[in-house]
Every structure is written in structure tokens, then in C-alpha cells.
Swiss-Prot record:
Snake venom serine protease that may act in the hemostasis system of the prey. The active site is at residues 65, 110, 204. Glycans are attached at residues 44, 239. Its main location: secreted. It is found in: Secreted. Keywords: Disulfide bond, Glycoprotein, Hemostasis impairing toxin, Hydrolase, Protease, Secreted, Serine protease, Signal, Toxin, Zymogen. This is Snake venom serine protease 3. It comes from Protobothrops jerdonii (Jerdon's pitviper). One of its GO terms (cellular component) is secretory granule. Expressed by the venom gland. Belongs to the peptidase S1 family. Snake venom subfamily. PROSITE patterns: TRYPSIN_DOM, TRYPSIN_HIS. It holds the Pfam family Trypsin.
Amino acid sequence: MVLIRVLANLLILQLSYAQKSSELIIGGHPCNINEHRSLVVLFNSSGLLCSGTLINKEWVLTAAHCDSNNFQLLFGVHSKKVLNEDEQTRDPKEKFICPNKKKDDEKDKDIMLIRLDSSVSNSEHIAPLSLPSSPPSVGSACRVMGWGKTIPTKDTYPDVPHCANINILDHAVCRAAYSNLLEKSKTLCAGILQGGKDTCQFDSGGPLICNGQVQGIVSWGGHPCGQPHALGVYTNVFNYTDWIQSIIAGNTDATCPP
């Protein structure tokens, strides 16, 4: 475990450029050590890939564009420099992406389920987050978190994950900024209208948490991050709850909503 942790630290510190969906938190602050128990690190030999969300002891939710070969998942991490005794590392056993996802459109159905090679144990720093029971309403207060950039135009990354409070905004706000935005049922528009708080590079795949439930998955947004009226776009998890539950139940041929 110590060797794996050392390697993971080296990889995470080798942060390289990735699209906005893998971003860091802009305008946030260091998360409390116990408030991100469901946050997962995805990494491979090149470094940090993305974040994810533990939704039960055997399954992780992340973005489809985070898919890569030979990655591992790290649970219970707070500081890259200080080991938590309950940190756990797992390999993916199976990966599920919507079979009806448009292959030439990275933004379409940007959701992936990962089954772990063995279950993780709940602990002081590890616990799953609930799937949504209903979609969030416009104006809902939400929380984002991750190890992404903290300054939009610089490769500045934190030792511990940063958190920020943002709001669900009307879909029309994002539609005005992004002509290629998917329909309302598939995505959530979230951020601060005047800018200053946003997800950024290497936050991709991480959770948008509203009312204690994972309502969104960090997908994409404006460049640089955190600009006025250029909000973050998140996969709408509620739209995919039936698919998620079907896959977990063993129906691996389940299809996502069109």
C-alpha cells in the first residue's frame, strides 16, 4: 500500500494539460478533510486523469471522456503529501459507457460507470454518495470539489482538494454561451453568473453535489475557467438513474435515454 501511495503521489504531481472537464476548482478553498469521502482519484502512468464519485462499495461514477487504459482508482485521499491510514486503491473490473453514445461527440452522454475489482470499505475518509431522487431546481445551492487548477491561466494545483459553492442556473444561460449545448434533460448548467467560481482542468468526472446527492458530473465548460456567463456544464445524473441502477443490478445490456 505504501509503494502504491508513493507511486500515486508521483503520478498526481505530474499533472499535464487536459480539457476543461478535468479541471481544478477556481475560486474555492481547501475542502474539510471529512467532506469529500466519496471523492475518487483516477490515475495512470501519465498522472492524474480525472475524479469520480463512489456511489456504493463496488461502483464509481465518472465522465465517459475520462476513460483510459490501465488506470487505477484511489479512495480516501486528502493530502498528496500526508497519507491517510484508510486510503485504498482498486483496479476497474468493468467499465460501462452508454451503448447509444455518439462515438464522434465527446460531450454526448458523458457518463461512465466503473465496477471495482473488489469492494472498498467505509471508513473515516471513505463513504458513498447517494444518487439523486429528483432533479435539482434552478437556484439550488451545490458543491463542487477536486484537485484541478486553482488559477485559470496557470498550472497551479492544490495539495488537498478544493471546494466551492455554486448554483444551478437556467439552461438558457448556458445555451446563450454555448451553441453546441445538449438538450436540457442531458445536462445541468451551474456556476456563478458573474464568474470567479468554477471547475477547471483535472476536475473532470467529479461530482456536483446538491442536497447531499450527486446531481451532476463535471463535463466541460468555458476557457479560461471561471469567466462571467461562461458556466460549467455537467452531465445530469438524474437523467441516467434508471440506466445506472440497471447496470448495477446486472442488466449490462441496458441502454441510456436517447
